[in-house]
Amino acid sequence: MSMTPREIVSELDAHIIGQNEAKRAVAIALRNRWRRMQLPEELRQEVTPKNILMIGPTGVGKTEIARRLAKLADAPFIKVEATKFTEVGYVGKEVDSIIRDLANVSMKLVRQQAVEKNRMRAQDAAEDRILDVLLPPAKDQWGNVQESDNTSTRQIFRKKLREGQLDDKEIEIDVAAQVSVEIMTPPGMEEMTSQLQSLFEGMSPNKTKKRKMKIKDALKVMVDEEAAKLVNPEELKQQAIEAVEQHGIVFIDEIDKICKKGEHSGGDVSREGVQRDLLPIIEGSTVNTKHGMVKTDHILFICSGAFQVARPSDLLPELQGRLPIRVELKSLNKEDFERILTEPNASLTLQYRELMKTEGVDIEFTKDGISRIAESAFRVNEKTENIGARRLHTVLERLMDSISFDASERSGEKIVIDEKYVSDALNDVVENEDLSRFIL
């Protein structure tokens, strides 16, 4: 991650409105990953990541920040829900599976990078295989390949192949047969399932099967096959583990849902158990994965939660201490809703305009229309449950309902969505609290 904090914030600004404090914290944490790697080896081991706790109501951008980070961070990244895990001894996934899943993500990322690195060599080898099908080499009576004078013909066909002139021609090729082993195991034993599948697939002989396909499709398949032959699996495992240990990022959502509430017991015991199981992973421990042992000392953890019922102080004190950076995300107001409708690169109004364009219908959202939509969403949030920006989706779906249904019969029309149009479509529902609760 060589982007500066300012560049990271700017990239997040293109998709997320407001919440500058959270963006800054995340940007600094990401940049510190790069800074740490520039330090001498001895000092580098001493610098641990400053984990982040994001606190804010639902629908203000916590999950969206995670989604955008996953695209920005050229590093192993995984987002998980805290509620999916149970403490050891209960039925369900154990928290160690977070690191195993992160190692799998890292392996996939490293393999993709290795394939891209070898793509040119793989492309040449794949072209040779296709040319062998199109122009089979001549063989003598003992089956040995003869030196022939078809080199010039081969070059002509290679040129046609690269220019795409042969793309739609069908050929029959030998491709590696995918061995699939289905194993049913109880919940919480996914790691055993994965290891058994790897074992049985490794025992199966490498088989090929004949498939008929267009040359452009055959070329893609063969490039992937040839690239896979050029990578060293053991080397990939080492690179994947190093990438996880030095650059891995884990985003844990809904962390507030595993807080112990008040003096209740029962199910809360398991919740507190999940927190206890998270402690060693966040602090630094070693987890066994199918790719090797992974140390979690330098993995960055970003946790988030609404904390509407529980409070951050309800987390175990030890866990609070392992999340030193606290960031509070603010509730969204009407002006924020207006910006969300227009400013992001793929704003909601732009999405609806482009969707309707596919039917030949031209949609125009006026400034006063957008203001009225934002006001309606804000008022419904105030009257009923506050679900933040997610309310805009339900309001817009209600607003666009008749247009979406009739669009295929209204090709060539231009529809202006102004304040009057929005009021006529939404007033009854917005004003009636019972209707708002069930429809919006």
UniProtKB/Swiss-Prot annotation:
GO cellular component: HslUV protease complex
Molecular function GO terms recorded: ATP binding; ATP hydrolysis activity; peptidase activity; proteasome-activating activity
Top-level taxon of the source organism: Bacteria
Localization, UniProt: Cytoplasm
Binding site for ATP: 17, 59-64, 253, 318, 390
Keywords associated with the record: ATP-binding, Chaperone, Cytoplasm, Nucleotide-binding
Keyword Nucleotide-binding recorded: yes
InterPro entries in the cross-refs: AAA+_ATPase (IPR003593), ATP-dep_Clp_protease_ClpX (IPR050052), ATPase_AAA_core (IPR003959), Clp_ATPase_C (IPR019489), HslU (IPR004491), P-loop_NTPase (IPR027417)
CDD domains: RecA-like_HslU
GO biological process, one term: proteolysis involved in protein catabolic process
SUPFAM superfamilies attached to this UniProt entry: P-loop containing nucleoside triphosphate hydrolases
Chief localisation class: cytoplasm
Record function comment: ATPase subunit of a proteasome-like degradation complex; this subunit has chaperone activity. The binding of ATP and its subsequent hydrolysis by HslU are essential for unfolding of protein substrates subsequently hydrolyzed by HslV. HslU recognizes the N-terminal part of its protein substrates and unfolds these before they are guided to HslV for hydrolysis.
Sequence similarity: Belongs to the ClpX chaperone family. HslU subfamily.
Oligomer and partners: A double ring-shaped homohexamer of HslV is capped on each side by a ring-shaped HslU homohexamer. The assembly of the HslU/HslV complex is dependent on binding of ATP.
Protein name per UniProt: ATP-dependent protease ATPase subunit HslU
Source organism: Glaesserella parasuis serovar 5 (strain SH0165) (Haemophilus parasuis)
Gene field: hslU
